[in-house]
UniProtKB/Swiss-Prot annotation:
Known function: Involved in peptide bond synthesis. Stimulates efficient translation and peptide-bond synthesis on native or reconstituted 70S ribosomes in vitro. Probably functions indirectly by altering the affinity of the ribosome for aminoacyl-tRNA, thus increasing their reactivity as acceptors for peptidyl transferase.
InterPro entries: Elong-fact-P_C, NA-bd_OB-fold, Rib_uL2_dom2, Transl_elong_fac_P/YeiP, Transl_elong_KOW-like, Transl_elong_P/YeiP_cen, Transl_elongation_fac_P, Translation_prot_SH3-like_sf
Entry keyword S-adenosyl-L-methionine: no
Cytoplasm recorded as keyword: yes
Subcellular location: Cytoplasm
Organism per entry: Arthrobacter sp. (strain FB24)
Main location: cytoplasm
Pfam families: EFP (PF01132), EFP_N (PF08207), Elong-fact-P_C (PF09285)
Similarity field: Belongs to the elongation factor P family.
Name the UniProt record assigns to this protein: Elongation factor P
Entry-linked NCBIfam families: efp, PRK00529.1
Amino acid sequence: MATTNDIKNGTVLKLEGQLWNIIEFQHVKPGKGGAFVRTKMRNVMSGKVVDKTFNAGLKIETATVDRRDYQYLYQDGADFVFMDTQDYDQITVSGATVGDATNFMLENQMVNIAIHEGTPLYIELPPSVVLEITYTEPGLQGDRSSAGTKPATLETGYEIQVPLFVENNTKVKVDTRDGSYLGRVND
């Protein structure tokens, strides 16, 4: 048992027989009244995101989660196959569990998988990844009233907005949390 004061991003709670992963949290201490913790959490099985508020100091049940490094091997239909880098065991993870991480995963990439009682809960990517742009229109200077961006397709098929000077076959750094362009990468 833990208290709401122990909540942080990535904590997995057991509430009403379900597992919930904390995405965001905020400890609030108003001038009047008791302190509380405002959270945004995702149901591990359904993917549903809800906002929930807890009173500060409330006892809550946390789930024991094992986080291990895995290497992404390949996609098998709607599922994804990963290899444990310590014992070389392979596990298959459903596309629903992988979620938006597919937008930033390449074969042989290292990821962190959270596992509870043998079941993969979610995938944690590094904060940023380097991917190559496979297609983007040429950037035209002029016809705009603000800083120019254009759509670009990454080698994973995901589309992001990049500055006008970025061209095809350019390696770029992308934020895996929101899919934003962070900069060009020199080889």
